[in-house]
């Protein structure tokens, strides 16, 4: 029947501005009003806060108080996961998320403590390189209690100025329970892959998963979608 179409995986391919986001919004409305899907079991991922706010506005306009599904960014959803699950890594749920400026400031602070003097441009370059390093989740164990000794060894043994700053930056993050933008998705994936009960809980909550602008997802965002 018609409802079966809404239960299958569907990819909509069309040129920009042709109404893909509107089609996704209408799909959510149909799931809730016609198939009686619990709104809280629907997750709609977008790439920007602007797109998320637009979707929320449309949903509110179409279905009013039924618009209680999650419609937001990947980072926003992963932040929800971390608020509930980060205790598993011995981090408090009051952890702090750095914006780009605060991250650059922390990098400069770490460099100063190491005796380096980083200019603004160099500190921003280091921030970009740290972002690249964090595309692989192998760094996360270094930011846990069990990785303190291994991290200290890396700080002591590396001669490369960037890696001295990088590993000291990880230590500073861990000591102060601070995450940067890259950590949000990576920590969420790490928890969901290391703790099966956490994965099952979030899978059971998310019965319908929708993603706007799927062609723009990176490998980590795609990995999250398929968990």
Locations of regions flagged by a protein language model:
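Glycine-rich phosphate-binding loop
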Residues: 1
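Conserved helicase NTPase motor core
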Residues: 4, 8-16, 23, 43, ...
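P-loop NTPase Walker
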Residues: 4-93, 97, 200
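Residues at helix-coil transition
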Residues: 33, 83, 112, 174, ...
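ATP-hydrolysis module of ASCE/P-loop NTPase motor domains
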Residues: 66-69, 87-183, 206
């Amino acid at each position: 029947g018609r409802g079966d179409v809404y239960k299958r995986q569907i990819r909509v391919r069309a040129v920009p501005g042709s109404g893909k986001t509107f089609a996704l919004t209408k799909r959510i409305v149909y799931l809730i009003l016609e198939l009686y899907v619990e709104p809280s079991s629907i997750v709609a991922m977008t790439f920007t806060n602007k797109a998320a706010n637009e979707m929320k506005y449309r949903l509110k306009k179409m279905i009013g108080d039924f618009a209680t599904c999650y419609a937001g960014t990947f980072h926003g959803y992963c932040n929800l996961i971390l608020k509930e699950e980060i205790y598993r890594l011995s981090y408090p749920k009051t952890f702090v998320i750095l914006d780009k400026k605060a991250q650059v400031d922390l990098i400069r602070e770490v460099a100063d403590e190491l005796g380096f003097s980083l200019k603004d441009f160099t500190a921003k370059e280091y921030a970009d390189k740290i972002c690249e390093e964090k595309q692989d989740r192998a760094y996360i164990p270094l930011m846990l209690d069990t990785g303190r000794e291994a991290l200290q060894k890396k700080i002591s043994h590396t001669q490369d100025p960037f890696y001295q700053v990088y590993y000291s930056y990880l230590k500073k993050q861990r000591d102060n329970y601070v995450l940067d933008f890259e950590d949000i998705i990576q920590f969420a994936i790490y928890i969901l892959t290391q703790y099966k009960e956490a994965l099952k809980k979030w899978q059971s909550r998310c019965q319908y998963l929708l993603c706007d602008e799927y062609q723009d997802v990176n490998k980590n965002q795609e990995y999250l979608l398929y968990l």
